[in-house]
Amino acid sequence: ALFLDPPPNLWAEAQSLLEPWANVTLTSQSRLPVLNFQGL
């Protein structure tokens, strides 16, 4: 049998609404530790 965890939750929080691309915090929430995580 193959058991798959649900995909991790991934979202970005912008520090500034006028310039959301200036300072963005990328947050990942997963049940299992992420071995290889690369930001986009």
UniProtKB/Swiss-Prot annotation:
The keyword Glycosyltransferase does not apply. Keywords: Glycoprotein, Immunoglobulin domain, Secreted. Glycans are attached at N23. One of its GO terms (cellular component) is extracellular region. The keyword Ribosomal protein does not apply. Disulfide bonds: none annotated. It is found in: Secreted. It comes from the Eukaryota. Its main location: secreted. Plasma. Interacts with CRISP3. This is Alpha-1B-glycoprotein. The gene is A1BG.
